Amino acid sequence: MARRYFGTDGIRGKVGEGPITPEFVLRLGYAAGKVLAGADRWAKTGTRPTVLIGKDTRVSGYMLEAALEAGFSAAGVDVMLAGPMPTPGIAYLTRALRLAAGVVISASHNPYYDNGIKFFSADGNKLPDEVEAQIEEQLDQPLACAASEQLGKARRLDDAAGRYIEFCKSTFPAAFDLRGLKLVVDCAHGAAYDVAPHVFHELGADVIPIGVAPNGFNINDGVGATAPDALVRAVRANHADLGIALDGDADRLQVVDAAGRLYNGDELLYILVKDRIATEGKVEGAVGTLMTNMAVEVALQEAGVKFVRAAVGDRYVLEQLREHGWQLGAEGSGHILSLDRHSTGDGIVSALLVLAAMKRSDKTLAELLGGVTLFPQKLINVRMKPDADWKGSDVIRRAIAKAEDALNGRGRVLIRASGTEPVLRVMVEAENVADAVQYAESIASAVKQATA
């Protein structure tokens, strides 16, 4: 059965429009609470489950947090409130505190007027599809408030930030520190605005923080992992050794070196795999996505590392890692998974892995990349109606076929719908920039014509 509300990364939309309304989010909290309370772990022991709620810095977070809290309480579930906290921080704390679930109020890299709800299970992983389906089924049931003596209670988790900071630091090798390193950290005016600078500072770095003045409306606005030009400028202006940009909920990152050169998730995956080979002797395989640059796939295979492409979305990368029993995977957007460090993508932890690789090898990022040159890619996002039948369009099919014939196996065409917004992503990879741009634009034009 198709899911009505849950996408690839929870439930997301524009605030005030379905489903991101206070009324729906209250019902969502209630439905999730009923599903959790009915789980064997709690039903058999007769104990009350507790969930942890965190959020990013959007102004709507206050409203949605209150609605979720009310819904959980009505279902007889206790609530702990972490306040602004990176998504991976909620995943870690949920697992560390042995809670029933974690909930994050965030729309990640989207503008402030969007928001979303995502859930983590007790082990710090995203909810299984079957649990999301149970929550959607429960949403169809009437809300029946628990008796007064069974209502859930809410309290603040005052030391949430400190706990998460210590966890992040624990993933960095004890033999190393960051003394002597001038580091720009861009927190996107988002959830990591407080914790991220502390992590790197406490490890010894000279930290220059930017994007650390959230006002409820400026999250991801010209800063962060989706707008890395701000980081490039700051690195150059401050003559920094390295720059790290997180997104609004700090589950992804981009890295900039002293020369102002940007490294994406594909390149960082290659660097981390090579570092793991140097320290452990062998890496059996790694996971990318349909969007991963062909140059990285070829380079990994030449290093004796199997490479598997998952569907786009970190949950699908995670599924492939588990299926193969591997540790390292990434998306070009900067979601990096290292399952021996964390159960989910974590921008801060991933940055520490990159820094550890540099420390171990005493090499720059450019040296660690070892001459791997990415194939030119052109990505065009085409907005369309949510119900547009782009797959059945002959116009789009002909444009794709023409491009693939011209590339003749020396490139790739990838068309996919976004899982979080009404956008069709057109990506063409070719041996040269001109071909990538030409064929991406011709396909995008066909998409606009077919979905107008």
Swiss-Prot record:
Keyword check for Metal-binding: yes
GO molecular function (one): phosphoglucosamine mutase activity
InterPro entries on file: A-D-PHexomutase_a/b/a-I, A-D-PHexomutase_a/b/a-I/II/III, A-D-PHexomutase_a/b/a-II, A-D-PHexomutase_a/b/a-III, A-D-PHexomutase_C, A-D-PHexomutase_C_sf, A-D-PHexomutase_CS, Alpha-D-phosphohexomutase_SF
Entry EC no(s): 5.4.2.10
Cofactor(s) demanded: Mg(2+)
Pfam families xrefs: PGM_PMM_I, PGM_PMM_II, PGM_PMM_III, PGM_PMM_IV
Keywords on record: Isomerase, Magnesium, Metal-binding, Phosphoprotein
Modified residues (Phosphoserine): S108
The record's account of how the chain is modified after translation: Activated by phosphorylation.
Aminoacyl-tRNA synthetase is among the record's keywords: no
Catalytic reaction list: alpha-D-glucosamine 1-phosphate = D-glucosamine 6-phosphate
Disulfide bridge partners, by residue number: none
Any single GO BP term: peptidoglycan biosynthetic process
Binding annotation for Mg(2+): S108, D247, D249, D251
HAMAP family: GlmM_B
Protein name according to UniProt: Phosphoglucosamine mutase
